[in-house]
């Protein structure tokens, strides 16, 4: 009986030891595009191995990611809405935002291109033609970085899209693409998600190259001043990793069918120390 009890105790201690050695879990809220294109599966495992931790990825739109971060329910965010990111930091919710990478947005449309926008480099004019012809347009409609950019373009075009022709998916980018494809409509999408799904779509690329379609991504640790429980040191270690020359090269060489999905943009600057308390 004593030997049996000793065995049970030892097994329990071993179990606790194994559980404790599993390391910390870092909570990362990020865009559906970085998740759906497989980029995170490409760049995160080396960090997890080096730091003996697990990164729990929450894939949502940028607006939702920021809301989760404001609530203190994640440790760090990787998002793509620069103005909103800067406001997020200015309001004390995040610290030490760093550039990570960029690509651009493009507009896809039906092969027949009923709006007649194929080849134009003016995104504002393209949306004006779509609206004037009441051609089907599918929006993310979810306050994501893509949706924020789309709303910016409608504002630039002096239009408020509404009516049966304007559909809101309220879903991630890949799901929105599928909906637009089914409806044979127009849609705005980040280039990486388009390239990742291109072979499954009937829609064709019709608008690209407008500077306003630039799409930068940034990483922001949640403020430990606002939420003392967050894993700030591990978050900053992740910032250091994704902006390091090694990871930046991994980002820059990540391809789909020979085409680069993202362009690194961190440069060689080291991550900053914790900003002064606001």
Task: Please give the residue ranges for each predicted region.
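Exported/periplasmic ABC-transporter solute-binding proteins
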Residues: 22-54, 63, 67-73, 81-82, ...
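Short, conserved active-site loops that position catalytic residues or coordinate cofactors/metal ions
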Residues: 72, 103-104
């Amino acid at each position: 009986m004593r030997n049996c009890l000793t065995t049970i105790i030892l097994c329990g201690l071993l179990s606790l030891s194994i559980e404790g050695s599993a390391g910390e879990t870092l909570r990362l809220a990020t865009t559906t595009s970085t998740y759906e294109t497989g980029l995170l599966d490409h760049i995160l495992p080396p960090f997890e191995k080096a730091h003996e931790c697990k990164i729990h990825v929450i894939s949502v739109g940028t607006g939702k990611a920021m809301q989760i971060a404001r609530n203190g329910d994640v440790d760090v965010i990787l998002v793509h809405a620069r103005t909103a990111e800067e406001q997020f930091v200015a309001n004390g919710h995040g610290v030490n935002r760093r550039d990570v990478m960029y690509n651009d947005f493009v507009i896809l449309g039906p092969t027949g291109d009923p709006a007649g926008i194929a080849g134009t480099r003016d995104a504002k004019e393209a949306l004006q033609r779509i609206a004037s012809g009441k051609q089907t347009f599918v929006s993310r409609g979810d306050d994501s970085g893509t949706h924020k950019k789309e709303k910016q373009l409608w504002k630039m075009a002096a239009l408020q899209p509404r009516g049966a022709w304007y559909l809101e998916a309220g879903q991630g980018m890949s799901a929105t693409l599928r909906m637009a494809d089914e409806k044979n409509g127009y849609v705005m999408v980040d280039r990486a998600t388009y390239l990742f799904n291109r072979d499954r779509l009937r829609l064709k690329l019709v608008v690209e190259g407008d500077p306003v379609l630039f799409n930068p991504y940034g990483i922001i640790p949640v403020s430990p001043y606002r939420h003392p429980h967050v894993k700030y040191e591990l978050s900053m270690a992740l910032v250091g990793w994704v902006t390091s020359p090694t990871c930046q090269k991994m980002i820059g060489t990540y391809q789909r069918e020979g085409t680069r999905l993202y362009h690194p943009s961190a440069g060689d600057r080291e991550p900053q120390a914790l900003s002064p308390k606001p």
